[in-house]
Amino acid sequence: MNELIREIGKSKGYDDKLCNTLEKIIPAMIMHYGEEYRDLILKVLEETTITICKSNENVYEVLNKLETIEEDESIVGIQDVKIAAGVSSTIPRISCKDGEFSIDKLERHIVLAFGDIESKAQIRTLVHEFSHALKSYENSHYIKGDIYYSRSGFIEIFERLSLDENGKVVRTLISEKNVGMEEGFNSLDDSIITSIITGEDRKFESYRGPAVIAEEADCLLGYRNERIKAQLTGDIDTYKNIYNGSSSEDLFGEQSKNLDEVVKEEYRLFRNILLYGSDKEEDKKLLEEIQNERAKLVHVCRNNIDKAIESKVNVK
């Protein structure tokens, strides 16, 4: 397999260090996600371009050259992208002919911040972003009328398509959901895969609140294979139904909203990460406020899992 991975890497112009890293990551991903997804993982490797920023660049600058990034109401804002360690993005090239929109092609990119790709931190980031790319491949993009749908794992985004005065296709956000849930499960997955690669105990390096809830959902509910299938194939409804069990409530939808609130606090914490160690009282208070809010929201999420466990027990 290493020969195939290196062959794909060299065909895309990757250097030896990146190829060496991919030779560690790809087998570990197959081990974690399952042999049945081997071909899908290799296909994503072949069709995704990995770019590492230069020392004077950030992820936002590189990504913005590929696709103009507009500020909207997304949970992840431009400022979050500017300080991100990495981003996975599927860029649709959409055209309009005779009033009908269509996807001409999809360009798949992973952009990593400047750093040593063989370092543990960069390996974990690449695992995280490659997992996002993997979960946004199958059944993930379509156009219906003037509505563009895109999916990355559990994340579902609906955008309205229109033309500007120059005839350029414009996408306007309508709705976005399940961001916190997806980041939690993806962080759980990247911690396991990174542990397989390094042989060290796994730990959550990012999205800790959502990741803790994701781990508890997998362990306590026992639907790990079903949730991985939902993320990789887009069969979200099946996972949603088994999560809800016999409950008359939409526990999945409720948990999704809870986790979106948790992830907002995660981003808020990350934006203020440089305040750690500050002697200023207002800085200490701000960090304490964010951490307390995150802790409250995590408690709400745990109550939701308790309900899901109860509904599972009551399934006839």
Q: Where in this protein do the model-derived segments appear?
A:
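Fold-level signature of zinc-dependent metallopeptidase catalytic domains
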Residues: 1-19
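Non-Sec secretion/translocation targeting segments of pathogen effectors
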Residues: 1-3, 186, 311-316
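Hydrophobic/aromatic interaction determinants used to assemble and anchor large protein complexes
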Residues: 12, 21-29, 140-141
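Charged, low-complexity interaction regions
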Residues: 13, 35-39, 201, 280-283
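Hydrophobic (often cysteine-bearing) scaffold residues that line and stabilize catalytic clefts
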Residues: 18, 22, 123, 178, ...
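Active-site scaffold of zinc-dependent metalloenzymes
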Residues: 49, 59-160, 167
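Post-HExxH zinc-binding segment in Zn-dependent metallohydrolases
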Residues: 147-212, 216, 220
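Pan-zinc metallopeptidase signature
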Residues: 201-316
